[in-house]
Design a protein with these regions (language model features):
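Alpha-helical, coiled-coil/dimerization segments enriched in small aliphatic residues
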Residues: 29, 140-167
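Short, structured coil segments at secondary-structure junctions
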Residues: 43, 68-69, 154-155, 207-208
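Short acidic active-site motifs
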Residues: 35-36, 61, 171-175
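Extracytoplasmic substrate-binding proteins
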Residues: 60-139, 161, 168, 216-279, ...
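A short, structured surface patch at a secondary-structure boundary
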Residues: 1-43, 47-56, 157-159
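A contiguous binding-surface segment within folded domains or other stable secondary-structure elements
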Residues: 43, 161-214
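Structural recognition of the beta-strand scaffold that forms the well-ordered cores
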Residues: 1-5, 47-51, 72-77, 127-133, ...
Length: 286
């Protein structure tokens, strides 16, 4: 087994040290595109599996890679609605159907729960949201982009731009003020701290009212970093922030169930509180 990217120390804490030393061979697709064919060939890998958004030309690229490496190269399409199918396919490919079905059933149940809740909230009553990233907070995760799957599903993502990019779109404070969202989500290492003190940010309805938070990021960003199965956790977290009246369960129990099912990790309440310290709207922290 080799990895597209190596694990950080904090990620290895959740996955286990046996995964920390696996070789990094880079990503086939995406912004990096740093796939190391020689390292894969030397590793003795028996199959290459790419999971994610299906893009034009991907099949041809994988066919060429398969010819070069002499081993099967497979792409499995995935999104919020199909993570269950994705894991079932992985289970069949790798001969671990029982474990894959456990995760698949969890993903399907989570998607159904949130879909059912969102059906009770008319589109016009959904919270106007901006999801901002970048050190200065001036990049937005645009409506209808692959990275915005969760935000689009559970809110009115008002970051409508002419040409949504794969990850984020550059914007400016004037545009953000014009959008004036009801709620702002900041990516990790973005402008969460700045927003609490900067005069320009304070002119926004969401910031003035304390209706903003930061996405948890352990072991991965819960919304889109990367846009993978961690989105299932974000899909359960974000609507509980935006529409708490629609849920009567305990957020810790919900998050702990995800960690147990996906990572086989027993998340303590202290760890949960640390991970989600900024995931609660500022107005509710006071």
């Amino acid at each position: 087994v080799v990895l597209a990217s190596s694990l950080t120390e904090s990620q290895a804490h959740f996955f286990g040290e046996e995964y920390a030393g696996l070789e990094e061979v880079g990503a086939i697709f995406g912004a990096k595109g740093d796939f190391n064919r020689e390292a894969v060939a030397a590793s003795g890998a028996q199959i290459v599996i790419d999971v994610g958004d299906t893009k034009k030309g991907m099949a041809e690229d994988l066919d060429a890679l398969q010819e070069q490496l002499g081993i099967p190269c497979v792409h499995i399409s995935s999104n919020l609605a199909t993570y269950g199918d994705c894991y079932r396919a992985l289970g069949e490919l790798l001969g671990v159907e029982e474990r894959a079905n456990e995760i698949a059933d969890y993903c399907d149940a989570a998607y159904k729960e949130i879909s059912d809740v969102m059906e009770t909230i008319p589109v016009e009553e959904r919270v106007d949201v901006l999801y901002l990233s970048g050190e200065d907070g001036l990049s937005c995760v645009a409506n209808s982009s692959y990275q915005a799957n969760v935000v689009d599903m559970v809110s009115d993502n008002i970051a409508v731009v002419d040409d949504p990019s794969g990850k984020s779109n550059q914007t400016n404070m004037e545009q953000i003020i014009s959008w004036d969202p009801e709620f702002i989500i900041f990516a990790p290492l973005s402008a969460y701290d700045l927003a609490g003190t900067d005069a320009a940010w304070q002119t926004l309805t969401a910031i003035e009212g304390g209706n903003y938070c930061e996405v948890p990021s352990e072991p991965y960003n819960w919304l889109n970093g990367p846009p993978s199965v961690n989105q299932v956790l974000g899909m359960q977290w974000l609507p509980r922030v935006l529409y708490p009246e629609k849920f009567d369960d305990d957020m810790y129990e919900t998050v702990a169930a995800y960690y147990k099912t996906l990572y086989q990790y027993d998340l303590s309440e202290d760890e949960f509180n640390e991970i989600t310290a900024r995931a609660v709207p500022v107005v509710d922290q006071k």
